[in-house]
């Protein structure tokens, strides 16, 4: 296989970091775009990646990052600005002659989405489609890593969440990275496609609690609660928080981005609305794309929990 250079954005995040590592392991050159120097960026540098620092919303930064790469992975965080960032990225990619862009969207991205972030992702997909670039959209269900955000509750033996009886097949970030790598290495087979991504088995949250209990060897109790109660429990180690406790501080920088709806943040509005989507079946489904494109069977929920046992114990 010939060595090529690929740009990985969001390189200090879950899917971006895994994509960069897998690309390097396969002998490719990786240029990783990061927002700032930190231990995650230093780790990628230690693995051999060229780490560059820049802003998605600065055209000069994006042009410099894309210069000379064969393909790129575009992953924008849950914050305002994705439509502008997509337009800048598409323009710079066309100028640089990039052969393929893999766009991380989400399964809830649709024209009538109530989540502003999800609707923006749908519009960002359309911007890429209009660009004339070879683009592949990925629409994953809930990441298996979402359970790590719930770890304070799980450590307390609880899984109190607002997702009703909806089902999803949790998909690990490293499995999504395998798909990203597979597409970028063979873009002609995938250009113009939109792929929903799932783990191997669907679960309700009661089912997830049952798997947690079995793998961890302790009871994890499921209960349907309100969205705000879940946030409070996430931020307080699974216990009822004291009066005045600010659960939303858990999300740090997300709280700096207000939503179009007064009194809410962009991320909180998204999380609240996709919880309703989950109840309504939007996140349901399963397929074998991790194996057929990524070349490896998707990680089971049991294996993911066992791998991260220390976080849940």
Give the positions of each predicted feature.
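Oxidoreductase cofactor-interface core, primarily capturing Rossmann-like NAD(P)-dependent enzymes
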Residues: 2-43, 57-60, 64-67, 78-87, ...
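Short, conserved active-site loop motifs that form the nucleotide-linked donor/cofactor pocket
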Residues: 48-50, 135
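Cofactor-binding loops of NAD(P)H-dependent oxidoreductases
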Residues: 54
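Residue-level recognition of oxygen-bearing side chains
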Residues: 61, 71, 303
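Short acidic/histidine-rich motifs immediately flanking catalytic phosphotransfer sites
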Residues: 67-73
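Structural recognition of the beta-strand scaffold that forms the well-ordered cores
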Residues: 73-74, 103
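A hydrophobic C-terminal alpha-helical subdomain
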Residues: 232-313
